Amino acid sequence: MPRSLKKGPFIDFKLEQRILDMNSKGEKKVLKTWSRSSMISPDFVGHTIAVHNGKTHVPVYVGDNMVGHKLGEFAPTRTFRGHAGGKAEKGGSAPKKK
């Protein structure tokens, strides 16, 4: 369920301040953050933010089409290794009829 418009978007204060400082200085550094629930604002566009996925920091380059989404949407927390081998590896499911 989306956040109430009355409250406004949640953006981590320290993260927003670091982005604004970098914008004023014209710097482009990778910022580490644990704030997966922060919403991406237009100030973030063009920066690379390393978002924590529970194990490591995943670098996320923020583009125009990402504004309004949350940082955690772009750093997956689970790795899909595929389903169990079984029938798919053996070469077929049913014998062919003549």
Swiss-Prot record:
Record region (Disordered): 77-98
Listed GO MF terms: rRNA binding; structural constituent of ribosome
Domain of life assignment: Bacteria
GO terms under cellular component: cytoplasm; small ribosomal subunit
Keyword Ribosomal protein in record: yes
Biological process (GO), any one: translation
Positions of disulphide bridges: none
Assigned keywords, A-Z: Ribonucleoprotein, Ribosomal protein, RNA-binding, rRNA-binding
HAMAP family: Ribosomal_uS19
Function: Protein S19 forms a complex with S13 that binds strongly to the 16S ribosomal RNA.
Family from the record: Belongs to the universal ribosomal protein uS19 family.
NCBIfam families: rpsS_bact
Protein name: Small ribosomal subunit protein uS19
